[in-house]
């Protein structure tokens, strides 16, 4: 009879515990790994690359007003050597300098060349205004075979002033120009250093020559330095060009007595543009905002590893070739051993017998969402994704890449290393500064991505916990947690019942009576098993006590009858 009761109780126990619902997250082995603040190489379900490495080997100019200077150097557009005749005035938002471009025809150099080049690169083009200078008693048609058009000529925007006749003394002159425009005027002039003293005397007469230039913010005097130099373009002389930015309503004055290359027109800059040095081919079929010497970087990523001197709206240059940004949860798929154990235990304990906790392992095949449910009941087994928790996590993760871009993108200007002798030290400082910035940003990039990855993984774990708590609050005393991410339900729960748990519409009062009855049956079975253990221990103790009492009684009788003697020695 006792055996029959035990069998019935056990059958009831198994029946009650047959219905089960488990929570888990998607997992599928894909080898996608990210680094966080505390760990390296954590596998995640989804991740995106943040470092661009793909280069377009062309200058993408679609939608841009582009000017290709070809053989003309950018500074040549201000002074006008023959190769720049078509670019003396222009409007553009993308200026391309070529390696073959040349700024000058007669040998010489520009003072503070790189600063002037940067100003012109950022301008949206050039427009010019005649300065109105007139001259008497001198020639204004100086020319040279170094600047050939159909014959010997000179810079289109400059006047080479010479004495009326050879060896005649050049008269002292003063010329002034007032900027009446609302924007600054770029004023440029030159100093001619003859190839010899004799040549200087022939061109400008005898005596020392002095040129003085001044405005409200500028004053400097120049003296030519005649002497032999290596011939370039057939010339041993040199022309050095100087410049200033003249504010609106300010006046520039020139005082000179020879060896002066006079400006003919003042230059005014138009708007904004981007200037690049590149020999890459133009392509009007693609659009770009970030350029470098090798072409165009087209990317929505926050970082790039293509060229440290890219300019425009560019991703930050970093030394790392890859920085993966987690856009999904931690990925811990079931391994082969785990799968074999699951298959073996299904035969004995059902679908969920061997599933580890929902944090330790994920489920493969949960393709409709990041989080979901598996259930087992009398109608069978099923799996369903939870869209709300998945969307909540996605909403918080979406925009991480854009936020990184906002933190890192900016308009870059390119400062080349074509420095003259005086500027070489400045160039070294700029190069050192650039390298230091790259080091800092490479570290910052790695840190920013690691912080975001840490937040993503913590966030997705948090959403899993929220989902688990939602189910626990619904089921209350109608179910029991098994410690592995599952709930053993104490009542019959068909597919509609399981759906109500997933949809957060489960009514625990509806099943409360049945669940309590089944819970009592389970507790009774547990209590009977525990009582039996107590009886066994009590029986064992009573038997030992009875055996000891009998032994002591026999000993007492024997001593009393003289059959046993007990001697106590002190």
UniProtKB/Swiss-Prot annotation:
Site (Cleavage): 349-350
Lipidation (S-palmitoyl cysteine): 566, 569
UniProt topological domain (Cytoplasmic) ranges: 555-570
Family listed: Belongs to the influenza viruses hemagglutinin family.
A Pfam short name: Hemagglutinin
Annotated localization: Virion membrane; Host apical cell membrane
GO biological process: clathrin-dependent endocytosis of virus by host cell; fusion of virus membrane with host endosome membrane; fusion of virus membrane with host plasma membrane; viral budding from plasma membrane; virion attachment to host cell
Xref: InterPro entries: Capsid_hemagglutn, Hemagglutn_HA1_a/b_dom_sf, Hemagglutn_influenz_A, Hemagglutn_influenz_A/B
GO cellular-component term (any): virion membrane
Species name: Influenza A virus (strain A/Equine/C.Detroit/1/1964 H7N7)
Signal peptide start-end: 1-18
Assigned keywords, A-Z: Clathrin- and caveolin-independent endocytosis of virus by host, Clathrin-mediated endocytosis of virus by host, Disulfide bond, Fusion of virus membrane with host endosomal membrane, Fusion of virus membrane with host membrane, Glycoprotein, Hemagglutinin, Host cell membrane, Host membrane, Host-virus interaction, Lipoprotein, Membrane, Palmitate, Signal, Transmembrane, Transmembrane helix, Viral attachment to host cell, Viral envelope protein, Viral penetration into host cytoplasm, Virion, Virus endocytosis by host, Virus entry into host cell
Residue ranges, Extracellular side: 19-533
GO molecular function: host cell surface receptor binding
Cysteine disulfide links: 22-486, 60-286, 72-84, 105-147, 290-314, 493-497
Transmembrane segments annotated in the record for this chain: 534-554
Glycosylated sites: 30, 46, 249, 253, 335, 431, 503
Subunit structure: Homotrimer of disulfide-linked HA1-HA2.
Membrane topology: Single-pass type I membrane protein
PTM section of the record: Palmitoylated. In natural infection, inactive HA is matured into HA1 and HA2 outside the cell by one or more trypsin-like, arginine-specific endoprotease secreted by the bronchial epithelial cells. One identified protease that may be involved in this process is secreted in lungs by club cells.
Principal cellular location given in the protein's record: virion
Official protein name in the record: Hemagglutinin
Other remarks in the entry: Major glycoprotein, comprises over 80% of the envelope proteins present in virus particle. The extent of infection into host organism is determined by HA. Influenza viruses bud from the apical surface of polarized epithelial cells (e.g. bronchial epithelial cells) into lumen of lungs and are therefore usually pneumotropic. The reason is that HA is cleaved by tryptase clara which is restricted to lungs. However, HAs of H5 and H7 pantropic avian viruses subtypes can be cleaved by furin and subtilisin-type enzymes, allowing the virus to grow in other organs than lungs.
Purpose: Binds to sialic acid-containing receptors on the cell surface, bringing about the attachment of the virus particle to the cell. This attachment induces virion internalization of about two third of the virus particles through clathrin-dependent endocytosis and about one third through a clathrin- and caveolin-independent pathway. Plays a major role in the determination of host range restriction and virulence. Class I viral fusion protein. Binds to sialic acid-containing receptors on the cell surface, bringing about the attachment of the virus particle to the cell. This attachment induces virion internalization either through clathrin-dependent endocytosis or through clathrin- and caveolin-independent pathway. Plays a major role in the determination of host range restriction and virulence. Class I viral fusion protein. Responsible for penetration of the virus into the cell cytoplasm by mediating the fusion of the membrane of the endocytosed virus particle with the endosomal membrane.
